[in-house]
């Protein structure tokens, strides 16, 4: 090779090196490290590093990596209180079982209506005006990631693990333009912390989280579901409810909302938004056609939605729990106001406090607790009962005189002014003998608030739901039936009717009028008709009360014999003639 050729070769080599270096400097950049896989089910379609969404504000990540799962998977989080089953398809809740409770068919109570949700969507589905985007986010396969603080803080694939609180579970979906992330944190109680965010490009978009298909015990009859299911919303100080039957069309209730959700007779599912001023509450009914149901029977479950009004993450807590005063009072803010004892809450709620004390400290049987509390109530009312019986005996003494006055005016019509004169004469007799005509009614009047209070307490307190007493009485919140040869016999109602009859037979009556006496003796049959469909705990209360009064009346009759009737005054006798 000559010198010129060598120079040309060296020049070419030098220029090649220079071009290579310049190309590297100006046209090539350092490739980023390969991102860590979120789970074996994830498939990353880009080498860009994963961008984490900002916790606050409306700005979303600048870059959105593609992050989608390969196939639907199920993930279960289970504690002593609940078992929640998630699906990675849509990052929704397919089942939320309250482990300590059974439904009407004696199966573990699932608050999610699975068959309805297969058609209508599952809890934690998102809703938004863009139908295509809504479908994409509810049908897409999310990538799950779990974090257990007590195990070193390393994220792992939850599909291959059994999760138990304390744990957090995050689902992420992205197609490169749209990203959705749902994060759930679980603790030892009934509260689940949730964070749902959807971003498009570099901006968050408003999102609504829904609970379709209704809530509660779905094994009840359609009539019971329709009457017992409510939407509840507002604040703990000012709570509003709307019956499911009253929801005719989609309604959005504006904030501020401290709480919003659904409830049935014994269970509640409540959203507690972190920012009450930035949410609304949406209610609607959904058409659902179960197999083998007629058009008339076709149910229309209630759907509830927590609406985010701002383009920002939607942060809230979910409380899916029994409507127990103790459980709901432990929530922050306390939710015990959800337990509605009705107009007689001032009696029903205080009645439950000693009843629960007796159950927890004396005897672990709700039926015997009712018996003991009833004995205590009747013992406390004994002085009033004695006073009432004394008043009844005094009225018996003057009964012939009263009868003479009534016979004197028996031909007078009701609208005749002389009827007023008759009443004045009767009241004069009572006054002369120091008798209060209403005195004998006091015990009955005092019993009525307790009766209604017990009714409301037994109808609302979840502690008495499926509570066993003895033998055939297995549910104090349900009517008493002993099934013999396929026929349900209301044994407690029969015993109550007999006891009430004997109690009235032993109690002196304040009247000698045969028609009124017959009417009073018919009262036990009226009570039987009234109590036939009531809870067995209610019948047990009245039966025990009647038995206690029989014992009391036995000793009263021995030590307080009835007084002899006064002779009819001559004036009354002459008037009769």
Predicted features along the sequence, with ranges:
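Helix-loop-helix
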Residues: 1-42, 86, 195-197, 211-213, ...
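General structural signal for secondary-structure boundaries
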Residues: 4, 62, 66, 78, ...
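Aromatic/His-enriched, Gly/Pro-containing loop or helix-boundary segments
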Residues: 4-7, 44, 160-162, 174
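Juxtamembrane extramembrane loops of integral membrane proteins
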Residues: 25-116, 171, 175, 573-577
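Intrinsic low-complexity, intrinsically disordered segments enriched in polar/basic residues
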Residues: 27, 34-54, 60-64, 134, ...
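Soluble non-transmembrane domains of integral membrane proteins
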Residues: 74-337
């Amino acid at each position: 090779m000559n010198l010129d050729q060598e120079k040309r070769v060296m020049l070419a080599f030098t220029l090649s090196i220079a071009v290579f270096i310049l190309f590297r400097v100006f046209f090539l950049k350092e490739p980023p490290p390969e991102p860590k896989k979120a789970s074996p089910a994830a498939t990353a379609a880009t080498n860009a590093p994963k961008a984490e969404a900002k916790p606050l504000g409306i700005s979303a990540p600048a870059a959105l990596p593609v992050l989608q799962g390969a196939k639907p998977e199920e993930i279960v989080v289970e504690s002593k209180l609940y078992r929640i089953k998630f699906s990675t398809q849509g990052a929704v809740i397919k089942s939320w079982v309250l482990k300590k409770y059974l439904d009407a068919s004696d199966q573990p109570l699932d608050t999610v209506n699975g068959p309805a949700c297969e058609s209508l969507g599952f809890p934690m589905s998102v809703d938004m005006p863009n139908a295509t985007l809504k479908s994409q986010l509810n049908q897409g396969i999310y990538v799950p990631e779990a974090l257990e603080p007590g195990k070193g803080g390393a994220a792992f694939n939850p599909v291959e693990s059994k999760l138990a609180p304390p744990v957090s579970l995050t689902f992420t979906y992205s197609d490169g333009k749209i990203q959705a992330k749902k994060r759930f944190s679980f603790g030892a109680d009934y509260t689940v912390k949730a964070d749902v965010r959807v971003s498009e490009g570099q901006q968050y978009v408003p999102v609504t989280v829904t609970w379709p298909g209704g809530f509660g015990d779905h094994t009840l009859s359609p009539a019971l579901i329709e009457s017992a299911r409510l939407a509840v919303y507002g604040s703990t100080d000012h709570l509003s409810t709307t019956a499911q039957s009253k929801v005719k069309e989609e309604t959005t209730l504006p904030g501020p909302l401290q709480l919003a959700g659904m409830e049935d007779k014994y269970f509640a599912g409540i959203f507690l938004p972190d920012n009450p001023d930035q949410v609304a509450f949406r209610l609607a009914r959904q058409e659902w056609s179960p197999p083998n149901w007629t058009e008339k029977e076709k149910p229309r479950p209630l759907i509830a939605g927590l609406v985010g009004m701002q383009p920002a993450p939607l942060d809230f807590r979910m409380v899916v729990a029994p409507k127990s005063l103790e459980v709901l009072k432990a929530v922050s803010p306390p939710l015990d106001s959800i337990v509605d004892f009705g107009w007689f809450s001032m009696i029903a709620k205080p009645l439950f406090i000693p009843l629960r004390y007796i159950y927890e400290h004396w005897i672990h049987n709700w039926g015997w607790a009712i018996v003991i509390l009833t004995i205590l109530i009747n013992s406390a009312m004994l002085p009033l009962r004695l006073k009432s019986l004394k008043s009844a005996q005094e009225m018996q003494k003057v009964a012939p005189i009263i009868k003479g006055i009534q016979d004197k005016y028996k031909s007078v019509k009701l609208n005749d002014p002389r009827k007023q004169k008759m009443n004045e004469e009767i009241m004069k007799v009572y006054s002369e003998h120091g008798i209060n005509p209403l005195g004998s009614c006091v015990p009955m009047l005092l019993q009525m608030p307790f009766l209604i209070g017990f009714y409301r307490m037994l109808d609302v307190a979840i502690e008495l739901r499926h509570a066993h007493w003895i033998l055939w009485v297995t549910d104090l919140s349900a009517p008493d039936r002993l099934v013999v040869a396929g026929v349900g016999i209301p044994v407690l109602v029969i015993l109550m009717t007999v006891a009430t009859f004997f109690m009235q037979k032993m109690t002196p009556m304040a009247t000698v009028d045969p028609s009124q006496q017959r009417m009073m003796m018919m009262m036990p049959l009226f009570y039987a008709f009234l109590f036939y469909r009531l809870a067995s705990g209610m019948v047990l209360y009245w039966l025990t009360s009647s038995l206690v009064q029989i014992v009391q009346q036995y000793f009263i009759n021995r030590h307080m014999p009835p007084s002899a009737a006064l002779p009819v005054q001559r004036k009354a006798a002459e008037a009769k003639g």
